[in-house]
């Protein structure tokens, strides 16, 4: 299951959080560049600007977690203040993320991971550059992605909330073609 929420944040807040992102050349980014992915990520609370810090805190709060839990029924969710797999993510020109499964057991809490939330926060993004996340069904026999369920465009202030179980295939398989300065 998944849900796409446009205007996820107040517009002014989303614009202000976008301005808190570190620059593309900032040395604090953790760089991934391998056969599966080409991206940068940062999940250090000490580096977040104050608005991002408050947003991450809210997304891990009982108030927000209980709202998301409604989507899952009887599943009990726990917040992840360590932001394992979370935080800032940046895909520049040439970026990609092959269709994949995330790790399903949290490395520190030993709990099953259940939810991913992606919030697109690049207002000047042109949809023609790519960056669409694709969500796929699971092929039980071959243990691989089977059919694409949805391809979600990276629209500013759009959130994509989806399950991240051991069968939740997703990715950005098409190489991003934005200008180098975006």
Could you say what each language-model-derived stretch is?
Residues 2-72:
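Non-heme Fe(II)/2-oxoglutarate
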Residues 4, 87, 116:
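Amphipathic alpha-helical recognition patches that constitute DNA-binding helices
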Residues 19, 58-113, 128:
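Non-heme Fe(II) oxygenase catalytic core, chiefly the N-lobe of the double-stranded beta-helix
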Residues 94-95, 102-113, 122-182:
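Catalytic core of Fe(II)/2-oxoglutarate
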């Amino acid at each position: 299951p998944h849900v796409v929420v446009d205007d996820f944040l107040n517009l002014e807040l989303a614009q202000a959080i976008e301005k808190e992102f570190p620059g593309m050349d900032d040395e604090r980014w953790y760089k991934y560049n391998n056969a599966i992915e080409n991206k940068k990520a940062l999940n250090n609370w000490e580096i977040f600007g104050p608005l991002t810090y408050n947003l991450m805190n809210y997304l891990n709060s009982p108030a927000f977690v209980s709202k998301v839990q409604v989507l899952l029924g009887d599943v009990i969710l726990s917040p992840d203040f360590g932001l394992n797999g979370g935080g800032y993510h940046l895909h520049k020109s040439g970026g990609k993320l092959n269709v994949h499964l995330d790790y399903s057991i949290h490395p520190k809490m030993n709990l099953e991971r259940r939810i991913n939330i992606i919030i697109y926060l690049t207002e000047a993004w042109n949809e023609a550059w790519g960056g669409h996340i694709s969500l796929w069904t699971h092929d039980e026999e071959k243990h691989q992605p089977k059919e694409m369920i949805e391809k979600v465009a990276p629209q500013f202030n759009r959130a994509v909330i989806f399950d991240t179980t051991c069968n939740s295939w997703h990715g950005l398989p098409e190489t991003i073609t934005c200008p180098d300065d975006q």
